[in-house]
Amino acid sequence: MPFDTDTDIEFTKGTLRHSEYHKILSKHFKVIVSHIFTGQDIFQYEPKEEYDCIVSNPPFRGKSKIVSRVLEFNKPFMLLQPFAIFNDRNPIGLISDQGKQVQILKFNQRAKFIKPSGLIEQKVTFQSGYISTGILENDFIVENLVMPTPKDIREYNKKIERE
């Protein structure tokens, strides 16, 4: 799994937080981690170790460049993206132009994100999910998210602010 770290680097407070990708996937798979902040930029880096697929939360900007680069690896992939990606023919077109089937993992509600400050974003104004090739059992899946309550988010954010 290139393009993630085993710890998320949180710069504003200088703390390290464990990556959710790494924590979950490493329970079942050997995970290769990489990240731009550790000198492994997706546009110049490919792991030397053998790997089977790419699971990543890439930047939401430069979607076409990211999809194009991931396609160069010729591996199944799963990328977290805002669904505004479907407003632009290019990123999705790049996948279908290579004869690959676009797969979608959508959530029943908007996901919450942790901001660089470590706080949970309370109001997310866009829908996001995963675009994928060759990973999902079905081409379109809707997954139910279990979300923290507003009270849980407030308590978590207060705890982070005190740290």
Residue ranges of each PLM-predicted region?
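Class I S-adenosyl-L-methionine-dependent methyltransferase catalytic core
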Residues: 1-163
